[in-house]
Amino acid sequence: MGKTEGQAEEFRARLDKRLDELKWLYSELYHNDENAFQYFLSMLYRMYETRPEPMKQLDREREANPDWCKSNEVLGVMLYTNCFGGTLRGVREHLSYLKESGATYIHLMPLLASPKGRSDGGYAVADFRTVEPELGTMEDFAALAAECHKNGMSVCLDFALNHTSEDHEWARRAKAGEKEFQDRYFFFDNWNIPNDFDRTVPQVFPTTAPGNFSWCDAVQKVVMTTFYPYQWDLNYANPTVFNDMTENLFFLCNQGADIIRLDAVPYIWKALGTTCRNLPQVHTLVRIMRMAVEIVCPVTQLLGEVVMEPSKVVPYFGTLEKPECNVLYNVTTMATTWHTVATRDVRLMKHQLGQIFALPKQYSFLNYLRCHDDIGWGLDYGFLKQFGIDEVGHKHFLNDFFRGYFYGSDARGELYNDDPRIGDARLCGTTASLCGIEAAEYEGNQWKLDRAIRLDIMLHAFLFTLSGVPVIYSGDEIGQRNDYSYHEDPYKWDDSRYLHRGNFSWEDAEKRKDPTTREGRIFTALRELETIRATHEVFRAEADTWIMETYNDHILGIGRYYNGEKLVALFNFDVQDGTAWINEPEEYRNLLNGDRCRATAYGLPAFGFVWLYWSKEEEIEAAKQAESAREAAEKQAEKERKAAARKKAAEEKKAAKQVAEEAAAKAATEEAAAKAEAEEAAAKQAAEEAAARAAAEEAARKTVEAIMKTERAAKKSGTGAKTKRTAKKKGSKK
């Protein structure tokens, strides 16, 4: 089989799996228009056939992993090309920074050709196949996309499918009177039907662009313009519109876009007597687009922009059997997050997240704190009513709080589309400025700055805790503040959204490696959180998630569990320190600092948070370590016991020896004493005997002396002879 035949077979296999449903829905919507359907099918094959081979290879790889965008390793960054890099080539030059930031998904805000001063930030598209010349060319985009893919990054583009610019070729030809192209829009000869529409259709921009219709002088007709007068609504009841717009979508996919953001998708079907929002036909169109994408370019994910109340958002996922959008903006959680910051009360957040956690895990949200758009206060006021909260009054409070008008607030923001008739307005501002960083730095108050940075980081930690795709608005990773220069630009000064659409500050970005700076503190903290999220399976989209009761209305608790891993995430939205009473019996490890603890009662500082982690594997390892420690302790104890026994035996031996030595010494002493006594007695006896002998000798001497004396005396007396005889006689007698 040749390459062409093989590709045709691949296309046919994908089509055959979906053909029955595709034909049924298309025919039902377009009244069995077989010609239109056949054109649609031929267009699908044409776009498949012209798809670059590297993209087809990526399709095949991701067909095996259709949920690639839901990986916990995915981190998105949304940016304006002109603000970030000046041009598409400039963005390409800064890919290393985005990679350093951890981005694996880059959303390039509207970059298609649109008329200056009438662009609605790029959403009034004049040509879906041409890049705005100031930003570069379509070839530049394709080169950027290819470079992103080489670096493991996906690319998202906006696709404004509800309308075109009045400068689009179709609109120009409609103005020229060509009915075929007028039929691609909604034209009316007078205001009768438009007025009927206005009775049920809400206004999108009641102050900056009131009404839903505009007068077209060129043809002397009324044209539907739901958003701005220069944006003409497309008529999707005309199959040519759907076919051609779908082809435009595939053109962008073939240039390298992996994710297509369907802008204003709830508005694309119109019917008199309705709100022209979220009609059943919209879901039919999105379902057809989803199947078409799976046939032509399976790598592509459809991201639905549905800025509505929660009950209107979820249906755009379709069903598990017949899915529509792959991913949806989690606009409700975004708005509820800022409500929680202002009120310091987590009860609405618990209620709202509880509804999301109850949805099928296959439903994936894009989670964000700030984006290019304003913050609309589309909260669950039915739930808030039980606390005595009035919708209009609460919106006033929120807008006052985030403009710094409320006592204790350091937030800095501006209103957008303030409608005094109904007391409604939306809010603009960067994450850093809404957290109080701008005000703290302006005041030079380090204590306030530390607290504001802590809040900023805590909100991002909350963002990363949720299942889905976390996306950071460019500049938030360095705490970039509001840009008030738009007030001086006549093309921008009537649109306060440019407050947070300022140029990326590369000067500030250079400070990201200095841990003492605001930029360095936030950048480093976010990278640490992103790395933890990407390397722990408990953050996977398939994880079980639930609200944990903290018995503290200021502290939000979220639990996650996946494949033997458990996470307890706690967030203190209060300006005071607080305690979460969660009574978790396991021993947890703090993912931020490695400390271990029993999570029964956990204290958090103001705007503090913690990620407590437990895993079966770690528990087993801990048990093994404990067993090893026990065995080691037992061995050590046995060793010490034996050593003690040896020591005792040695001591006893030493003591016995000492006793023996002492006894021997005593015996020797006693023997010596006895000997000494005997010697003394003998000496005494000898002395006595000597004395006796001496006495005897003395007596004898004295006797001799006496005799001699007597003899001498006798001689002297003349009787010597007689005396001698007498003495001799006496001596013999004796």
Segments the model singles out, each with a brief description of its role:
Residues R712-S732:
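Arg/Lys-rich, intrinsically disordered low-complexity tails that mediate electrostatic binding
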